[in-house]
Amino acid sequence: WVPGTRGNIDHIVIAPAGVFVVDAKAHKGRIEIRDRGGLFRTDYRLTVGGRDCSSLADGMGWQVQAVLTVLRDHGADPAPAVTPVLCFLEVEWPLFRAPDSFHGVLIESTRSLARVLTSTTVLTVAQADELAALLAERLPAK
Protein backbone atom coordinates (compact mmCIF):
# COMPACT_ATOMS: atom_id res chain seq x y z
CA TRP A 1 0.00 0.00 0.00
CA VAL A 2 1.06 3.53 -0.60
CA PRO A 3 0.79 5.58 2.60
CA GLY A 4 -1.57 8.52 2.24
CA THR A 5 -3.52 6.97 -0.64
CA ARG A 6 -6.24 4.39 -1.16
CA GLY A 7 -4.20 2.74 -3.87
CA ASN A 8 -1.84 -0.14 -3.96
CA ILE A 9 0.98 -1.25 -6.19
CA ASP A 10 0.66 -4.85 -7.41
CA HIS A 11 4.39 -5.58 -7.62
CA ILE A 12 7.66 -3.71 -7.28
CA VAL A 13 10.44 -5.69 -8.93
CA ILE A 14 14.10 -4.89 -8.33
CA ALA A 15 16.03 -6.74 -11.01
CA PRO A 16 19.40 -6.52 -12.74
CA ALA A 17 17.76 -4.27 -15.35
CA GLY A 18 16.44 -1.80 -12.76
CA VAL A 19 13.32 -1.02 -10.76
CA PHE A 20 9.94 -1.92 -12.24
CA VAL A 21 6.37 -1.26 -11.11
CA VAL A 22 4.35 -4.19 -12.46
CA ASP A 23 0.57 -4.25 -12.67
CA ALA A 24 -0.62 -7.79 -13.47
CA LYS A 25 -3.89 -8.18 -15.38
CA ALA A 26 -5.85 -11.34 -16.17
CA HIS A 27 -7.85 -9.90 -19.09
CA LYS A 28 -8.94 -12.14 -21.95
CA GLY A 29 -9.02 -11.41 -25.66
CA ARG A 30 -6.72 -10.06 -28.33
CA ILE A 31 -4.43 -7.20 -27.30
CA GLU A 32 -4.01 -4.34 -29.78
CA ILE A 33 -3.27 -0.66 -30.04
CA ARG A 34 -5.97 0.90 -32.21
CA ASP A 35 -6.31 4.38 -33.65
CA ARG A 36 -9.81 5.56 -32.79
CA GLY A 37 -9.15 9.04 -34.15
CA GLY A 38 -10.74 10.51 -37.21
CA LEU A 39 -9.36 11.71 -40.50
CA PHE A 40 -7.48 14.66 -39.03
CA ARG A 41 -6.34 13.40 -35.64
CA THR A 42 -5.01 10.30 -33.98
CA ASP A 43 -6.38 8.79 -30.80
CA TYR A 44 -4.51 5.61 -29.92
CA ARG A 45 -6.17 3.20 -27.51
CA LEU A 46 -4.94 0.04 -25.84
CA THR A 47 -7.64 -2.59 -26.31
CA VAL A 48 -8.03 -6.11 -25.00
CA GLY A 49 -10.87 -8.15 -26.46
CA GLY A 50 -12.21 -4.95 -28.02
CA ARG A 51 -12.46 -3.18 -24.64
CA ASP A 52 -10.59 0.07 -24.11
CA CYS A 53 -7.92 -0.56 -21.47
CA SER A 54 -5.97 2.67 -22.01
CA SER A 55 -6.73 3.84 -18.49
CA LEU A 56 -4.67 0.94 -17.11
CA ALA A 57 -1.53 2.44 -18.62
CA ASP A 58 -2.52 6.01 -17.86
CA GLY A 59 -3.13 5.12 -14.21
CA MET A 60 0.40 3.88 -13.60
CA GLY A 61 1.94 7.34 -13.35
CA TRP A 62 1.10 7.83 -9.68
CA GLN A 63 2.54 4.40 -8.84
CA VAL A 64 5.86 5.21 -10.50
CA GLN A 65 5.89 8.61 -8.79
CA ALA A 66 5.27 7.01 -5.38
CA VAL A 67 8.25 4.67 -5.81
CA LEU A 68 10.48 7.48 -7.12
CA THR A 69 9.53 9.70 -4.18
CA VAL A 70 10.54 7.00 -1.68
CA LEU A 71 13.83 6.42 -3.48
CA ARG A 72 14.69 10.13 -3.68
CA ASP A 73 13.55 11.02 -0.16
CA HIS A 74 15.62 8.26 1.40
CA GLY A 75 18.98 8.68 -0.15
CA ALA A 76 18.98 6.87 -3.48
CA ASP A 77 21.22 9.32 -5.33
CA PRO A 78 20.79 9.32 -8.16
CA ALA A 79 17.48 7.48 -7.97
CA PRO A 80 17.34 4.69 -10.54
CA ALA A 81 14.75 4.88 -13.28
CA VAL A 82 11.44 3.26 -12.40
CA THR A 83 9.79 1.55 -15.36
CA PRO A 84 6.02 0.93 -15.43
CA VAL A 85 4.87 -2.44 -16.82
CA LEU A 86 1.45 -3.88 -17.58
CA CYS A 87 1.80 -7.66 -17.53
CA PHE A 88 -1.11 -9.44 -19.22
CA LEU A 89 -1.51 -13.05 -18.15
CA GLU A 90 -4.17 -14.45 -20.48
CA VAL A 91 -4.43 -12.24 -23.56
CA GLU A 92 -4.09 -13.34 -27.17
CA TRP A 93 -0.95 -11.81 -28.65
CA PRO A 94 -0.88 -10.95 -32.36
CA LEU A 95 1.66 -12.84 -34.44
CA PHE A 96 3.01 -9.64 -35.98
CA ARG A 97 3.46 -6.20 -34.46
CA ALA A 98 2.49 -7.04 -30.91
CA PRO A 99 2.41 -3.84 -28.84
CA ASP A 100 5.57 -3.31 -26.81
CA SER A 101 4.56 -0.10 -25.05
CA PHE A 102 1.67 2.32 -24.67
CA HIS A 103 2.00 5.86 -23.28
CA GLY A 104 5.41 5.00 -21.83
CA VAL A 105 4.25 1.78 -20.15
CA LEU A 106 5.78 -1.51 -21.24
CA ILE A 107 3.23 -4.10 -22.37
CA GLU A 108 4.44 -7.61 -21.55
CA SER A 109 3.43 -11.23 -21.03
CA THR A 110 4.88 -13.23 -18.16
CA ARG A 111 7.41 -14.78 -20.53
CA SER A 112 8.52 -11.50 -22.11
CA LEU A 113 8.65 -9.78 -18.70
CA ALA A 114 11.29 -12.25 -17.54
CA ARG A 115 13.44 -11.27 -20.52
CA VAL A 116 12.98 -7.55 -19.83
CA LEU A 117 13.99 -7.92 -16.18
CA THR A 118 17.25 -9.64 -17.07
CA SER A 119 18.06 -8.02 -20.44
CA THR A 120 20.67 -5.62 -19.09
CA THR A 121 22.49 -5.03 -15.83
CA VAL A 122 22.23 -1.58 -14.30
CA LEU A 123 22.06 -2.63 -10.64
CA THR A 124 24.57 -4.67 -8.69
CA VAL A 125 23.34 -7.29 -6.23
CA ALA A 126 24.25 -4.97 -3.35
CA GLN A 127 22.34 -2.05 -4.90
CA ALA A 128 19.31 -4.26 -5.56
CA ASP A 129 19.35 -5.54 -1.97
CA GLU A 130 19.57 -1.99 -0.60
CA LEU A 131 16.69 -0.76 -2.77
CA ALA A 132 14.57 -3.80 -1.91
CA ALA A 133 15.03 -3.22 1.83
CA LEU A 134 14.19 0.48 1.52
CA LEU A 135 11.07 -0.08 -0.57
CA ALA A 136 9.86 -2.95 1.65
CA GLU A 137 10.14 -0.66 4.68
CA ARG A 138 8.53 2.43 3.13
CA LEU A 139 5.89 0.73 0.96
CA PRO A 140 4.94 -2.33 3.03
CA ALA A 141 2.75 -5.12 1.71
CA LYS A 142 -0.71 -5.20 3.20
PLM features: what roles do these ranges have?
Residues 1-7, 15-19, 28-35, 39-142:
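Surface-exposed interaction regions that form or flank ligand-binding interfaces
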Residues 10:
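Phosphate-centric recognition/catalysis
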